[in-house]
Amino acid sequence: MSWQTYVDDHLMCDIEGTGQHLTSAAIFGTDGTVWAKSASFPEFKPNEIDAIIKEFNEAGQLAPTGLFLGGAKYMVIQGEAGAVIRGKKGAGGICIKKTGQAMVFGIYDEPVAPGQCNMVVERLGDYLLDQGM
């Protein structure tokens, strides 16, 4: 299965039969390379991805400044050090799950709830972890 298929079928999917979808999604390598992304994923700057990688390696780096992706600023909220970063921006937000070799990104806006985004992103991340990825 291609990485693009994971994005299209497992991240940009209908969430629990609600007809709702994430706004955008992507899978990156832990080195910052893009493995696959939705067409709607924001144009990002390399330093934005570098800051996310640094946060996974040294939790607490983004809380004072916020997480930036595609120029949008997300307020960093609770996550799991070294494993999950969650951010909020207005009625939407972001969830990023780190596995051994990948980072799974999900971005949402209303009517999708934070917990729905977290479930979609973390479920794929946990599956990849189980597969040794």
Curated annotation (Swiss-Prot):
It comes from Artemisia vulgaris (Mugwort). Transmembrane segments: none annotated. This is Profilin-1. Keywords: Actin-binding, Allergen, Cytoplasm, Cytoskeleton, Disulfide bond. One of its GO terms (molecular function) is oligopeptide binding. Pfam families: Profilin (PF00235). It is found in: Cytoplasm, Cytoskeleton. GO terms for cellular component: cell cortex; cytoskeleton. The keyword Ligase does not apply.
